[in-house]
Curated annotation (Swiss-Prot):
It holds the Pfam family Response_reg. Required for stress adaptation, morphogenesis and virulence. Residues 50-74 are annotated as: Disordered. This is Stress response regulator protein 1. It comes from Candida tropicalis (strain ATCC MYA-3404 / T1). It comes from the Eukaryota. Residues 62-74 have a biased composition (Acidic residues). SUPFAM superfamilies: CheY-like. The gene is SRR1. The modification 4-aspartylphosphate is found at D189.
């Protein structure tokens, strides 16, 4: 069972599957629905998770308090249910953004990191983050793997504590979602069943309404040939899995891409 999941900084929310009736509802808002989040991935071993909303008890009109408390809010949000999930996929090597590794200071475009390489450092140090970006960005993450969705969601929440994030496992739903919601950036896995990240990127770039939408690939496929193909189909940037880059580098790259797209 595939779920659409949404995180809103002011009201915790999630999205159920798009049924035929929901698809026909032109007024659907993916940031306003409020059922609980589920991590059901057709596995009896995965339990149902419900998020708590650390922002519900705050005065939404007090921006100064929000600014002062963003560290606390971010910390609370990063206590992610992913930490309690037993990962049974023995070949999955995609590390938590909060797990310290040797920090990569080069561009993700120029530095391809093997998931089988020695990423773990003996002298562990956490990823640094100079200052979170408090812009209310809207992000869409598309990945058929629930664990990968959760990890990228955690990275983005640490970089952008006030962002609104929709997570989608079923790539066939992306077309309908893009017709109904605006996003500042879409993060795509490349290898997905039925509709790939390449297919989604081509669809986005074929519609001039989405010219200001950044498209970022997050994938293990980062050969020179792959990167050239991504560029040709309109993908703005590529991050390699696992995301063991400094948070400042990831955030700076995303900010630059969004700014460049909005200037078109």
């Amino acid at each position: 069972m595939n779920y659409i999941m949404c995180r809103n900084n002011l009201s915790q929310s999630s999205l159920p599957q798009l049924s035929s009736s929901a698809v026909n509802d032109a007024n659907i808002d993916y940031f306003s629905l409020k059922p609980k989040l589920s991590l059901d991935t057709n596995s009896s071993g995965n339990s149902e998770i419900i998020y708590s909303d650390c922002d519900n008890n705050k005065n939404n009109n007090d921006d100064d308090d929000d600014d002062d408390d963003y560290n606390k809010d971010t910390y609370d949000e990063l206590l992610d249910p992913f930490d309690t999930i037993a990962v049974n996929q023995h070949d999955l090597e995609y590390y938590s953004p909060l797990t310290p590794f040797e920090i990569q200071n080069t561009s993700p475009q120029d530095s391809i990191i093997s998931s089988k390489s020695s990423n773990k450092s003996n002298s562990l140090q956490p990823f640094p983050l100079t200052l979170p970006n408090l812009t209310n960005y809207r992000f869409l993450i598309v990945d058929d793997n629930i664990i990968n969705l959760k990890i990228l969601n955690r990275v983005l929440l640490k970089l952008y504590p006030r962002s609104n994030i929709v997570q989608v496992q079923d790539s066939k739903l992306v077309n309908e979602i893009l017709q109904r919601q605006h996003f500042d950036s879409v993060f795509l896995d490349i290898e997905m069943p039925d509709i790939t990240g390449i297919d989604i990127a081509k669809f986005i770039r074929s519609d001039e309404r989405f010219n200001q939408m950044a498209v970022i690939a997050v994938t293990t496929r980062n050969s020179a040939k792959d990167l050239q193909q991504y560029k040709e189909c309109g993908i703005d940037h590529t991050f390699h899995k696992p995301l063991n880059y400094s948070l400042d580098l990831i955030g700076g790259s995303i900010d630059d891409i969004i700014e460049r797209r909005k200037s078109l």
